[in-house]
């Protein structure tokens, strides 16, 4: 069995040491069961990442992922439209560190590709899906969507249907792009509602009448 109390002690020790080692750079530290989350301003992200990678006490030599969260319609929108989470792994400490920051809509943040080669593709994915621009990136172009794609499909305000219909025309033997044509007006469904609520309501209203 895992010794979670000991793991938490390690995380607290690392967090407090970081706060004292680079004063003024760390905005907030949160201690989770399986990882340590450190929140910083986006302008200080690269400095803190470099320290976590190179300092002998941390040795966060692996960037496993960069996660982007669209904060539209949730409380964190007050801090920034997007939350970026850099998932680091320290084999030396047998722990994961999440370094997080916030970026505005169509915001700019400096690339981390100079520190971690794995971030080259990860940052391209975030640029393609969310529209966050990574300054000084060696090859920032779309990686998942089609050529000439308009918009950023994982933003919450991007229409589910998209803007264009793309298909291969067998007769013309070419790919066709045309505007989306809906046979009925688009509807927003309440996925939180229990199935049959509306029918039960109508049934009860008819009984009352």
From Swiss-Prot:
| GO function terms (MF aspect) | NADH dehydrogenase (ubiquinone) activity
Keyword NAD in the entry? The reply is yes
Reactions catalysed, semicolon-separated, are: a ubiquinone + NADH + 5 H(+)(in) = a ubiquinol + NAD(+) + 4 H(+)(out)
* InterPro entries the record matches: NADH_DH_suC, NADH_quin_OxRdtase_su_C/D-like, NADH_UbQ_OxRdtase_30kDa_su, NADH_UbQ_OxRdtase_CS
What are the record keywords, sorted?
Electron transport, Membrane, Mitochondrion, Mitochondrion inner membrane, NAD, Oxidoreductase, Respiratory chain, Translocase, Transport, Ubiquinone
Q: Which leading EC class covers this enzyme?
A: translocase
Q: EC number(s) for this protein?
A: 7.1.1.2
Share what the entry says about its subunit structure, partners included: Complex I is composed of about 45 different subunits.
In its UniProt entry, what is this protein called?
NADH-ubiquinone oxidoreductase subunit 9
- Source organism per entry reads Dictyostelium discoideum (Social amoeba)
């Amino acid at each position: 069995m895992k010794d979670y109390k000991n793991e938490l002690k390690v995380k607290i020790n690392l967090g407090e040491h970081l706060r004292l080692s680079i004063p003024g750079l760390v905005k907030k530290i949160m201690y989770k069961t399986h990882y340590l989350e450190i929140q910083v301003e986006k302008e200080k992200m690269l400095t803190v990442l470099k320290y976590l990678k190179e300092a002998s006490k941390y040795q966060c030599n692996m960037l496993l992922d960069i996660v982007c969260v669209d904060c539209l319609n949730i409380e964190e929108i007050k801090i920034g439209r997007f939350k970026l989470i850099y998932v680091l792994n320290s084999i030396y400490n047998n722990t994961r560190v999440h370094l997080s920051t916030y970026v505005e809509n169509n915001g700019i943040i400096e690339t981390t590709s100079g520190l971690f080669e794995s971030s080259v593709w990860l940052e391209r994915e975030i640029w393609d899906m969310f529209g966050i621009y990574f300054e000084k990136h060696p090859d920032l172009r779309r990686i998942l969507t089609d050529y000439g794609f308009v918009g950023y499909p994982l933003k919450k305000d991007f229409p589910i249907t998209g803007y264009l219909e793309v298909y291969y025309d067998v007769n013309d033997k070419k790919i066709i792009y045309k505007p989306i044509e809906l046979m009925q007006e688009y509807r927003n469904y309440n996925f939180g509602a229990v199935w049959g609520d509306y029918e039960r309501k109508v049934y009860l209203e008819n009984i009352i009448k």
